[in-house]
Amino acid sequence: MENQYIYRVNASSTTLRSGIAVAEEIEPSITFSAPPEFQGEPGHWTPEHFFVAAVAGCFISTFSGIAHFSKFEFLSLELETEGTIAKDEGGWRFTQVTLRPRLKIAQEKDLDRAKRLLEKAERSCLVVRSLTTLVTMEPDIVLEEEFIERQKMGNSVPIS
């Protein structure tokens, strides 16, 4: 079916609270553990990191696709993504994911368009659309010359 795709991952337990995830035709496999705060092994990817990484990867891919189809040129995109978990009556769950994209552009005339395309990427990202968790975005759109100045000064001030 053209409007449906299936993605498979196989996971197996290797030690108490740890394992390995494998996807066909994708290298490398990924070792994972429960987070240390839940008696997992430190220094490993966790299911919580996978969750946040899925949101981040989807957002980057979605924005890049939208920018390409919109013929919007940007110099770089970096994304800090933060997931917050909390315990409620049903147990632990993600309560919020915050996206902090930092988009570097060359021309001031593209500031408003850049913001609109970032917002469209947030709305269009299939992983974000699949969540019941609150997802917020704190964009930082930087002009190339301003980016160079910020690097010299060592600070960042979002443009909104």
Feature annotation, model-predicted:
Residues 1-53, 63-160:
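Extended beta-strand/beta-hairpin segments
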